[in-house]
Amino acid sequence: LSVVALDARKAGIVDQEVDVFTVKALFSTLTNVDFDPARFVDLIGRCAVLRDALKNRAKKAGAIINEKPAVVTFQPETTVTGLVGQAKVASLKADTQANADIQSLQHILLFGIKGVAAYADHAQILGQEDDKVYAFVQEALAAISRENLDLNGWVGLVLKCGEINLRTMELLDAGNTTAFGHPVPTKVPLGAKKGKAILISGHDLKDLAQLLKQTQGKGINIYTHGEMLPAHGYPELKKYPHFCGHYGTAWQNQAREFAEFPGAILMTTNCIQKPRDAYKDNIFTCGLVGWPGVTHIADHDFAPVIKKALELPGFAEDREGKSVMVGFARNAVLGVADKVIEAVKGKAIRHFFLVAGCDGAKPGRNYYTEFVEKAPKDTIVLTLACGKFRFFDQDLGDIGGIPRLLDVGQCNDAYSAVQIAVALSQAFNCSVNDLPLSMILSWYEQKAVAILLTMLYLGIKDIRLGPSLPAFITPNVLNVLVENFAIKPITTPDEDLKTILG
């Protein structure tokens, strides 16, 4: 579809339906989004229908469609078994004679544009689009399908992916802040209130807004889970009195946490895991998320979720708990930039750490908890994405009224972190690389790859990456990253802090 769309674009034909479908279909293939085979059979079949319709339309308009690439005439099977058989041929790994370094860069590009697609879909839902985002996603997919580029050509596309992802995160930032206001520092309870309850997980703030609106006056309290935590900082969401707190931690702990939750559960976007029998009847999906046998809400009418919440017992009594602060996105942080600059100049703040990225179950992720705990008291820790759940409830104190732990937001709020870094570099009249700022990133899935590519596009160096380096990066490609960007694997918190701070 992207090969045809790219050829059609050369003749001035741009199809909005194709563009939106492309990012939604790509987003569906992200880790922990859609596990429903029937939906993928439909998606793949629809993709072929859209491709053939666009091909015919483009030809009639005088476009030259290159039909040599097999993907332009490929007809998918209509069953799961048939498609699995075809997948062995379609896979990037199918060509065993291919250059391993080029295959590595193709994988990086593919994972990167999947991350871009996720953010583009969220932005589009909130009314924010840029045609160059769709055009690049199609350019990248077409290149993977048919281009015979050299190593430098693929490196160029990978860095362009970082550029496009920056623009996409900017669109999503505009969508979120236009619809819900700029986040403000907000205290979020981690306990629970007596009463009926719904837990909402994932990333989609529009779904949350709809749920809050539909549950007004029904005696149901709404709790966030996972990356929904930063939603409490948005003025147009926090205004609802029944939006009462946060429950649980990161995505990989959901089986235990969901089983103990006494209400209904709504999964938006990723990150769903196989539901346990204990709560399978209480969990719902919406948007692009899917699991076979789980009720899917396709139209933002959350009546079934509300009905289930009213049937379930809810919390029998109030539960005391800690509280955490959220809402330190670019607007809030830059609003106190003068205090931050003064504290740096007065040596009250020695260094900033951006400790961010995905969480996961793999051993070694306790590095991030230990790193934050051991960071000296004259340092500030900015965090975003679900990696924060390794330490989000730590009380690190403050420096002159500035909290030492600043939650910038969801993974896409890397845009906010970049804007904060750029503003500080301008204030100190230096490059971002010359700031007293170190980036300690954890990676797990495709959005983290897209964010890393954005950092590389911006020329940011000395990024520490863990808990291990991605398996799809070959030694030669890693060498390019090390030589050009000084990327390095994490070691131990003590060793890395010593190297950074001296």
Regions found by a protein language model. Give the residues of each.
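Anaerobic metallocofactor- and corrinoid-dependent redox/one-carbon enzyme cores
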Residues: L1-K24, S28-A38, G45, V49-D52, ...
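N-terminal alpha-helical interaction blocks
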Residues: V133-E147, L157, C161
